[in-house]
UniProtKB/Swiss-Prot annotation:
Pathway(s) it belongs to: Amino-acid biosynthesis; D-alanine biosynthesis; D-alanine from L-alanine: step 1/1
Catalytic activity field: L-alanine = D-alanine
InterPro entries from the UniProt entry: Ala_racemase (IPR000821), Ala_racemase/Decarboxylase_C (IPR009006), Ala_racemase_C (IPR011079), Ala_racemase_N (IPR001608), Ala_racemase_pyridoxalP-BS (IPR020622), PLP-binding_barrel (IPR029066)
Catalytic residues of the enzyme: 33, 250
GO cellular component assignments: cytosol
Protein name: Alanine racemase
Family matches, as PROSITE patterns: ALANINE_RACEMASE
Binding site for substrate: 129, 298
EC number: 5.1.1.1
Residues where N6-(pyridoxal phosphate)lysine is found: 33
Family, per entry: Belongs to the alanine racemase family.
Annotated function: Catalyzes the interconversion of L-alanine and D-alanine. May also act on other amino acids.
Needed co-factor(s): pyridoxal 5'-phosphate
């Protein structure tokens, strides 16, 4: 069997939730959209079932999957519905929809609901993707408040630059949010992972923990308070020694500078490892760091082995405990979210 493995350490997931909940205070949503950022939404949700105040997803299908698996917690649809007919499933599965544009609002208010719905009303406080502008927010809130079909309203917005503390954008967005919601009763939600960790003023009634929940610092590098949940590993299935000035891989982008031990490992861009990862991207053989050499292929990669490192059959960590996924993402010119969400053709093992 091809030895590409993903370990999901559910104990680390629980640890991270506790840390983030303690920091935020109040209530905390575990964001499990995109199959829990590639970790497996159902397994992660059940691992957090006795801790989490609720879960957040992006689509109706993601919410239904959690409900049909037995999750009874609040489930927030962060993007709301994509067509009016989806409100039927919102009611059937007791989901909490976000409302972030005029047609979502009108469709919700024009529907005859059998039971009142809890609405997350989104403000565009400066990210300019979705949400009502601050100067329109109070009137939209009033329209929802007057409806017999609306149970309660959570006021929320999303930060564009919370992972860039020096930008000043988070403070600008908080000011816009506070002005736009002034005098409007009800719960609030502002803090994403970066704000939970770094912006105390953004910690309102509900937090939304995404990247940090999976043990990854939104600021790059590592955060000793968090434990990585995903570990991607494979094994060396070929080994050879190349003479100096030997090219390796497609495009002959790397030439050895000396006699070099080369290990061939079972992972490539078809598995989700980024093809853009250059030579010198880190990997670890039995816990000892080394590097990728040559271009990443569809199904395999080549790595450098020094004289002291084990070869054929030995484990190679691509990211996890020794290799920080932020380092791999930075080398490849991408972000850790993309790396985790793209993993496929791997065996997943869940460790309690």
């Amino acid at each position: 069997m091809r030895p590409l493995n993903v370990q999901i350490r559910l104990g680390n997931l629980r640890h991270n939730y506790r840390i983030l909940k303690e920091m935020h205070g109040g209530k905390l949503l575990a964001v499990v959209k995109a199959d829990a950022y590639g970790h497996g939404a159902v397994r992660c949700a059940f691992a957090l079932a006795d801790l989490a105040d609720g879960f957040a997803v992006a689509t109706i299908d993601e919410g239904i999957r959690l409900r049909e698996s037995g999750i009874t917690h609040p489930i927030v649809l962060l993007e709301g519905v994509f067509e009016a007919s989806e409100y039927e499933a919102v009611e059937q599965y007791s989901l909490w929809p976000a409302v972030g544009n005029q047609w979502q609002l009108e469709a919700l208010l024009s529907r005859h609901w059998k039971k009142p719905v809890k609405v997350w009303l989104k403000m565009d406080s400066g990210m300019h993707r979705t949400g009502f502008f601050p100067h329109d927010y109070a009137s939209v809130y009033a329209a929802l408040k007057q409806s017999e079909y609306v149970d309660s309203i959570v006021k929320f917005s999303h930060f564009s630059c919370a992972d860039e503390p020096e930008s000043g954008m988070t403070e600008i967005q908080m000011e816009a949010f506070d002005l736009g919601t002034e005098g409007l009763e009800g719960e609030e939600s502002l803090a994403n992972s970066a704000a939970i960790l770094n912006v105390p003023e953004a910690r309102r009634d509900w937090g939304r923990a995404g990247l940090a929940l999976y043990g990854i610092s939104p600021f790059g590098g590592s955060d000793d308070r968090l434990k990585p949940v995903m570990r991607l590993s494979t094994r060396i299935f070929g080994e050879r020694v190349l003479q100096p000035h030997s090219p390796i891989g497609y495009g002959a982008t790397f030439y050895t500078s000396k006699s070099t031990r080369v290990g061939l490992i079972a992972c490539g861009y078809a598995d989700g490892y980024p093809r853009r990862a250059p030579s010198n991207s880190p990997v670890a053989v039995d816990g000892k760091l080394t590097r990728v050499i040559g271009r990443v292929s569809m199904d395999m990669m080549t790595i450098e082995l020094d004289a002291s490192q084990e070869g054929l059959g030995h484990e190679v960590e691509l990211w996890g405990d020794t290799v920080n996924i932020n380092t791999v993402a930075e080398a490849a010119g991408t972000i850790p979210y993309e790396l985790m969400c793209n993993i496929k053709r791997a065996k997943f093992t869940y460790i309690e």
